[in-house]
Amino acid sequence: MDKTSKLFDVWANTGRSEDMEKGHGTTVNQFLDKLSLKENFRFLDIGCGNGWVVRKISQKNSCTKAIGIDKSKMMIKNAKSKILSEKESYFVTELESWNTTEKFDVIFSMESLYYSVPMEFALEKVFKLLKKNGVFYCGTDFYSDNTLTTRWRKDMNVPMDLRSEKEWKMMFKTTGFNTHSKHVTDSKNKSKWKREFGTLFVIGSKP
């Protein structure tokens, strides 16, 4: 088990998965609630934690299947204990080594892709998992433009791939995505960076 998996197992056992759900919830829900999703879509959440996004999406009538993956066994255990719908499935796996024939219309990731160092291999796997015209919505608070979060790598002492917004978008384009980005802020949050920089969402559409 690598350092990142061990860390997130500890977090799952100490209530941090619920803390992350609450901490990310404002900007993620703002973003997800504005998405226009097609009929009969299949959804994947990479680094799903306790499965809160999978549960939210599975409640949409147009969602036919919602899968969450995480390399933390304890996070997946938590997610399975909270299942609300038969549409939901959860798997303990790293993205890059996940052996699946599944294809998805929508793939989502919040604060997880940068734990794959370097990120290019993970992003290539995402591209392969998407159907034609599928979309990858990738959220991150850890990017070099947001200088107040760059210390996280030292604080957490696990491998993390730090890029600028420009570098994120270039990486998506190089992989083959049509790409744009947007920031979602939380104007009432006590943290300055959440008010001013917010969550960076890089959006990639597969041609």
Protein language model regions, located:
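Conserved beta-strand signature within the Rossmann-like core of class I S-adenosyl-L-methionine
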Residues: 133-140
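Short alpha-helix
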Residues: 160-176
